[in-house]
């Protein structure tokens, strides 16, 4: 069976990364594409299901996993830990399913060190004006918060060249089509096609 591909997807807040990934998943069967389910030490929110939205663990369990080098990447955010399990990810990839990781550039660097075969995609907004409009979309944040989020977005965008692919999300449907094209092209790589069509190739080359 052909090995699945691990996709790293990063973008500044407001670029539409999560919306694009969710739209992609609606067009792909579960046996083809999945989003990685992270481990976290934060408490479940209403409606969240263990193993579906997150794997909820306590701080001691998480630190034990760090000690065992069980994570492809991990980070602390507002006092809670988040991490991507190496074992879980490798098990899914082994079934031929492509796995998407929605992470920032720092997490992407950690994963590249451990799984250099991963493919990475960076998503940019079409302009700073549009990014500012999207960041203000909720209408709940102060000017100070907006300015801070914009500064964080610029810092994130400065790492775009570290990625394999670049998508500019100006028109959502076009950006989604670009994302699908990347996935399709990766599935047609020689390494995957040789595994997928091994029996056919053997018959075609037989005397």
UniProtKB/Swiss-Prot annotation:
Protein's UniProt keywords contain tRNA processing: no
UniProt cross-references to PROSITE patterns, sorted A to Z: GUANYLATE_KINASE_1, GUANYLATE_KINASE_2
Compartment(s): Cytoplasm
UniProt keyword annotation of Nucleus present: no
Catalysis: reaction(s): GMP + ATP = GDP + ADP; dZMP + ATP = dZDP + ADP
Key words of the record: ATP-binding, Cytoplasm, Kinase, Nucleotide-binding, Transferase
Main location: cytoplasm
InterPro entries the record matches: GK/Ca_channel_bsu, Guanylate_kin-like_dom, Guanylate_kinase, Guanylate_kinase_CS, P-loop_NTPase
Ligand binding (ATP): 11-18
Guanylate kinase-like domain mapped to chain residues: 4-184
MF annotations from Gene Ontology: ATP binding; guanylate kinase activity
One GO cellular component term noted in the UniProt record for this chain: cytosol
EC code(s) of this entry: 2.7.4.8
Family: Belongs to the guanylate kinase family.
Role played: Essential for recycling GMP and indirectly, cGMP.
Protein name stated in the entry: Guanylate kinase
Species the sequence originates in: Salmonella choleraesuis (strain SC-B67)
Name of the gene: gmk
């Amino acid at each position: 069976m052909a090995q699945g591909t691990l996709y790293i997807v990063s973008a500044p807040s407001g670029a539409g990364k999560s919306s694009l990934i969710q739209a992609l998943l609606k067009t792909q069967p579960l046996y083809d594409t999945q989003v990685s389910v992270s481990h976290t030490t934060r408490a479940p929110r209403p409606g969240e299901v263990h193993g579906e939205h997150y794997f909820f663990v306590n701080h001691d369990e998480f630190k034990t996993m760090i000690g065992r080098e069980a994570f492809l990447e991990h980070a602390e955010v507002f006092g809670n830990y988040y991490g991507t399990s190496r074992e879980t990810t490798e098990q899914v990839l082994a079934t031929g399913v492509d796995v998407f990781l929605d992470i920032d550039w720092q997490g992407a660097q950690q994963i590249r060190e451990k799984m250099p075969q991963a493919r990475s995609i960076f998503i940019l907004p079409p302009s700073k004006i549009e990014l500012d409009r999207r960041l203000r979309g909720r209408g709940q944040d102060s000017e100070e918060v907006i300015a801070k989020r914009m500064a964080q977005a610029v810092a994130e965008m400065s790492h775009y060249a570290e990625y394999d692919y670049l998508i500019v999300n100006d028109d959502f449907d076009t950006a989604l089509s670009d994302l699908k094209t990347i996935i399709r092209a990766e599935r047609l790589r020689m390494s995957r096609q040789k595994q997928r069509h091994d029996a056919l190739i053997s018959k075609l080359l037989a005397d």
